[in-house]
Amino acid sequence: MENIIQKIREIYPVSDEALQALQANMELRYYPKDTYIVQSGVTDRLVYFIEEGIARSVFHHNGQDTTTWFTLEGDITFGMDSLYYQQPSVESIETLSDCKIYVIHIDKLNMLYETYLDIANWGRILHQNVNKEL
């Protein structure tokens, strides 16, 4: 989880204890290139931490694919509508290379937000930064 931890700590100084709790609640998965880890029209309640590889968020409309976001090593990605509103995702997330990804269910991440102030602050600042980039 070296890339993920480095990126987390670039955003906020999360303690070793909190990072250990985060890692204990994650599952390691491997996805081959060209895999849709989130599919439009499907509700997905997972947060994906990219340790190795690259993925893109893509919006499908009228037979056209529009890339809206790239997720690099150390970054997180998720279906926004699914995660925030428990509705089917309007975008898909596709791996552009073979990927090593840690996943965590949003309920577990919310539990960590409630337990560890530094994880909650990291999440808040992360979302502020993403919204600023939009």
Summary of predicted features, one role per range:
Residues 1-134:
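Cytosolic regulatory regions built on CNB/CRP/Popeye-like sensor folds
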